[in-house]
Amino acid sequence: MLKKTLLAATAFLALASGAFAEDLKEFRVGIIGGENEADRLKSYQCVVDQLPAVLGVQKVSLFPAADYDGVVQGLLGGTLDYAELGASGYAKIYLADAKAVEPILTTVQTDGSMGYYSILVARKDKGFKSVADLKGKKLGFADPDSTSGYLVPLVTLPETVGAPVKEFFAETGFGGGHENLVLEVLKGTFDAGTTFGSGVGDFKDGYTSGNLRKMVDKGILNMDDIVELWKSPLIPNGPIVVRSTLNTDMKSKFKDYMMNLPKSDPACFSAIEGGDFKSFVEVTPDFYKPIIDARKATIGG
């Protein structure tokens, strides 16, 4: 009996040590949709190059998802180790399984703020002067799991227009991410659409950071072609999350690497975050409680 017990314990330890070793071989990075895949992979290449030595893994693999939910499901399923999410995407994970991931950091803008805005844009040549002019028109959202591209306008636009979104607009739809949404507005698929920006600086420049600024910098958007019709209250910057079951040593090394990145490699930091950011700051789930509550009340899990 004792021999069987010892053999069973030995087998268990072998499996456990094997699982631990496997955990250290590869670090898996989820990248949410929003811009084309080639640009997303290019932005994260510095992480692929640097993290193996930092974490002691053999390789870092990038998994760009077609939409936000691809990364959400990967994190819920334990097949991703790290991702940067919008607050609503994190809320979706939290409501499904509060212990699946840990929010560890978020970004800080150069002006010290820790938030951004949902921005409603339309083609300038449509002649819309305010959001009131959009009554009975077609509205495009970025993605069902986007904070600025769906959740926040769904909750706060009714306060401006005096009616629920589905009653005020004749039709709503999704553009397939922020970049695609703006392109669809320009094509005329939607009369207006929701995207995001820092709200700092000039609209004519695409603000200092956010989707509009990225599109301007990439040469695929002329700000003279669009107008801003509405801007939301401040939205908390989304979190960097890690898989909760990731071993403690790796979590600590990864967190330290990210915290130091703005100084150790400003170019890499800028490539990942884009625009007007200066550093990271630690966060906990409590920072996102208002978004979690808003999502639970309006969308559900």
Where on the chain are the PLM-derived regions?
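A bilobed periplasmic-binding-protein/Venus flytrap-type ligand-binding module shared by bacterial periplasmic
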Residues: 32-34, 117-128, 230-248
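Pocket-lining segment of extracytoplasmic ligand-binding domains
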Residues: 138-140, 144-247
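An extracytoplasmic/periplasmic, membrane-proximal ligand-sensing/linker region
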Residues: 24-31, 35-46, 52, 211, ...
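Sec/Tat signal peptide C-region and signal peptidase I cleavage site
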Residues: 17-21
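Hydrophobic residues within well-ordered alpha-helices
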Residues: 75-76, 134, 185-186
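Extracytoplasmic small-molecule ligand-binding "clamshell" domains
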Residues: 22-91
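Flexible hinge/capping segments at coil-to-helix
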Residues: 122-143
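Beta->alpha turn/N-cap motifs
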Residues: 33, 64-68, 78-97, 107, ...
